[in-house]
Amino acid sequence: EPPGSTILRDLNTGAPNGVLLEMDDFLEGKIPAPTIQELASGVAEASQALVSLGITALQDATPSNSISRWETFVALKSDDALSQRVTLMIGGESTTKFLRSGVGRASNDMNLRVGAAKLMVTKTSGSLFPDVTAIHETVRKLDNKGFQVAIHAVESEAVSAGAEAIAWTRTSGSQLRHRLEHCSEMPPVTLEQVVASGAIVVTQPGFVYASGRRYLAETAAADHPWLYRIGGLRK
């Protein structure tokens, strides 16, 4: 298994059951990519479906977004395959290349723009990945480069580590407001850390509607009050 990833297995046989967690980058390198024509056709169909729902703007939060992905979006926009305005988050490791190229950073074109630098923090494999030291170092470097950081954090340990890293940027005088994505699990201490950090919390009430029963079934009853604490954040 790649670091930070998990291949779920049958409890009796130990054989992989087909569920792969946090393995997007690995799979992207193994699955043949569609041609630009195939991609444009699929994107055009999806774009029209979104238009029919009144959706006029999108944000791609894929953590592996790179210069080449940006160029793909430029081509899709140029060919009118994609009519929505697009904000493209970029992978933290790609920020130096974006800065050197100047791509999207100084543009006032709202049809396609560079957004936050995405950092994945997970506990899918049983331990925090990356570790706390690496999280702090990455957030510090991205903040120094002038990028807003969007930290994917679901488990309480991930939320806590992300909040601590963001809080540090405030003590250093940063004027940027960084993001915590999801914040699915927040016991009282973690909630206090998030509030104190000043982070923008980007959570998904729709997940509760779509998967709330599963969350309750798969989470210990004692932890139910700490799931998706949108009301607690508002207070």
Give residue spans per PLM region:
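Structural detector of well-ordered beta-strand residues that form the stable sheet scaffold
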Residues: 87, 150, 179-181, 202
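Divalent metal-coordination and catalytic microenvironments
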Residues: 54, 114, 152, 180, ...
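Distinct, well-ordered alpha-helical segments
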Residues: 70-75, 96-103, 159-171, 193
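Short acidic/histidine-rich active-site segments
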Residues: 61, 147-157, 203-205, 233-235
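Aromatic- and carboxylate-enriched substrate-binding clefts and catalytic-loop regions
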Residues: 176-188
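Catalytic pocket of metal/acid-base enzymes, prominently hydrolases
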Residues: 1-89, 102-146
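Active-site beta-loop-alpha junctions enriched in small/polar residues
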Residues: 63, 89-93, 117-122, 152-156, ...
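Active-site-adjacent C-terminal substructures of enzyme catalytic domains
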Residues: 185-235
